[in-house]
């Protein structure tokens, strides 16, 4: 007879199987029981500041370049409370990154959303005169962050990515290709040659004037930094100068027309406002009317070179007709 028919041995097996089943059911029941407390998560310690010297141990090349950058003043001074830990003023506390050497354990402004990256810069730069309009500027509205034009580590004028004035212009041209094309026309501001810069006329951080135009004083556009003789104040002003500005007659970047005019000849510019060609021929010495009024038969060639007589087209101190 085999062992399976031995009563004593079978009884022992049955008892062992019952105990094992009961133990297993107890464990699974405890896991499935509603409200059973989950094991507590491991405590996460926040990163701490370790100072720039810890950063230099691995990032020596960046540290050497940073010493020539205007932002290095944050490291050596205490203007904003970041002395000896300038790296962490932008990248945040670095203890975890120092331990793990993982990029995931440090803030990377270049990978943040533009608005979030700008907040870091504006912590220090918000109240500077050239930056007061940054939040509502056209660059900010179009998601162009500070780091698109500025380098935090490299050495350049005012921390710019570009080092030379001509390179700054090319930096702007990287986005404004249509404007750059205007500077290739025969009559232009000498910007491609490096004689002037985009920021001579535009404030890239924002302005109270359209197109981020620089202001000289009050609401006067930046044109008058160089062309001050055209602004007055005049006793007799030419209304478009005050109401529309220089671009009523001139192309600001470049033109195919002399003096960067919007039209091929001066009289065609004048006729945009002073046109009375729809009025019948007048009697001798009579005004043709029009809005604004004109006093000559402009269909006659003798009256089509306006600036032959009206020489002070921007404004005059002595003559209401802008003759002199």
Predicted ranges, named:
Residues 3-5, 13, 26-324:
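Short sequence/structural segments immediately N-terminal
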Residues 12-20:
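Sec-dependent N-terminal signal peptides
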Residues 23:
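Flavin (primarily FAD) cofactor-binding/catalytic cores of flavoenzymes
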